[in-house]
Amino acid sequence: MAHDFSGLLNPSLLKMSAYSVEGGQQAEIKLNQNESPFDLPLWLKDEIMDEFKHEAWNRYPDILPFRGMKAYADFLGIAPESVMMSNGSNEMLYTIFLACLSKGRKVVIPEPSFSLYEKLAVLLQADIVDVPMHDDLTFDVDAIIARTNQERAGFVVLSTPNNPTSQSLRLDDVRRIVSGVEALVLVDEAYVEFSREESALTLIDEFPNLIILRTMSKALALAGMRIGFAITNPQLLSEIAKPKIPFTSGRLAEITLQHVLRHYSLVDDAVAYILRERNRLLGELSSVSAIHTFPSDANFIIIRVDDARHVFHALQDEGILVRNVSGYRLMENCLRFNIGLETENDLLLEKLHRMKG
């Protein structure tokens, strides 16, 4: 018998649905979650496990993963006091939103953006001020600044390069926004390693209201390890840390991060490959009249077709899983797929040419 728990739960849940991935997470060729096509080499995994097996598994990890935070701070050339590590960047998003939002507070979110931003704002009963992007899916910087100030919003969230549009803000535009509003500005740089634009990291010392979010899931190929970071000034970071759940990052994640940062040439090589393949795929697809391609600054590509749902299912029937992002604002009949291995990319091209050529 069904029970009605609505009166006992957070009323915001009535406006939400559980996170899901259309088509699932298993496929012969999986290109739907913006993952790296490259796993860590076995020799590096062995090196990591050789260290990890000597850790005390019966003891809690540190409240905050200080070894991982110092390793990443040293890698970036910044003070460890400006860095906080989390169990994936999604956990850090939860932490930052908890620190910045509550019922009735306003948050500015360009649309379309990463869906978790809206979900978290709704959960916290905040008021969302959405700012549509231009029709070509580029940011409307003037509108972001104007709406933030008009609405007196205290929090702005920017994803650059943006998921799902794959386009970036120029550093000068980030500077304009951060300096032009009286709000905390979160810049989510999950895909920054693939961008033609400079990171906002250079602005951290200049603007005390700037927070940068990073993930190790994309370029560093550590999606299964769940490693994310917030970077900001120590005073603001100490406040953001207050709602963070303790002990969420395990020692294995810390050790893995340290070893991958020591062998960063593996990341450089993978990023170089992805950029080459991105350019190749964009060039191939731009020659197909029935496919519209958008510029990409990430490890994934956005295309528009006449019937995205049909193409999505046709590719799925061929064992190729992409993402149907048609439900996002301004992205009707759009599909998203990350750069895979060369053989996977070739097969995707072949199927798209056959369907739309």
Swiss-Prot record:
GO terms for biological process: L-histidine biosynthetic process. It comes from the Bacteria. It catalyses: L-histidinol phosphate + 2-oxoglutarate = 3-(imidazol-4-yl)-2-oxopropyl phosphate + L-glutamate. InterPro entries: Aminotrans_II_pyridoxalP_BS, Aminotransferase_I/II_large, HisP_aminotrans, HistidinolP_aminotransfase, PyrdxlP-dep_Trfase, PyrdxlP-dep_Trfase_major, PyrdxlP-dep_Trfase_small. Its EC number is 2.6.1.9. The keyword Transferase applies. Keywords: Amino-acid biosynthesis, Aminotransferase, Histidine biosynthesis, Pyridoxal phosphate, Transferase. PROSITE patterns: AA_TRANSFER_CLASS_2 (PS00599). Its cofactor is pyridoxal 5'-phosphate. The keyword Amino-acid biosynthesis applies. It is an enzyme of class 2 (transferase). It holds the Pfam family Aminotran_1_2. Gene3D superfamilies: Aspartate Aminotransferase, domain 1 (3.90.1150.10), Type I PLP-dependent aspartate aminotransferase-like (Major domain) (3.40.640.10). Homodimer. Belongs to the class-II pyridoxal-phosphate-dependent aminotransferase family. Histidinol-phosphate aminotransferase subfamily. HAMAP family: HisC_aminotrans_2 (MF_01023). NCBIfam families: hisC (TIGR01141). This is Histidinol-phosphate aminotransferase. It comes from Prosthecochloris aestuarii (strain DSM 271 / SK 413). The gene is hisC.
